[in-house]
Each structure stands twice: as C-alpha cells, then as structure tokens.
Amino acid sequence: MLETDYVLAYYHTKPFYPVHIVAVPKKHISSLITLEENDHDLLLELMGIIQKIASMMTEEKSGVITNSGAYQDSKHLHWHIVFGKPLK
C-alpha cells in the first residue's frame, strides 16, 4: 500500500474492519514502550505515513490503534489504521 526505506504499510491479511491497514517500521522494535532515543527519526517517519493514510479516512468511524503488553499479539511495533464498523 505504501513503503519507504524505513516503513511499510500494508492491508491487514485478516481484516477486522472494511479498511484495515497496518503500518510498521522495517527495523525491529518490539513495542512502543521499548523505543530508544535513536529511534525518534524513524518514529517521525512512521507517524508521517500513518497521518497520510489516516487523512484518507476522515469519516466518523475511523481510528489509529497500537497495543502494548498483553494486548500486543505481534511483538513488533505496529499501528492499525482502520475505517468502518468492525466486521466481526
């Protein structure tokens, strides 16, 4: 869907929403709470990609979500950009 040298955004393989996009840094970062100071530029680029995608979905039912701890299934930092009512 969208890719830079450091960030990949793709359509979720098992979507929970009509539009369900996942944005990840290509560098392994396990979660939001493990970010280090030298990751700030990467995080800014990731947020820019998320903002670009989210700006395409301006309806009421949209969101940008990240999880940590027990709620984080994939142990790689990622954000879900979603639109519409949940499918399930």
Question: What positions do the PLM features span?
Answer:
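HIT superfamily nucleotide-processing domains
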Residues: 1-88
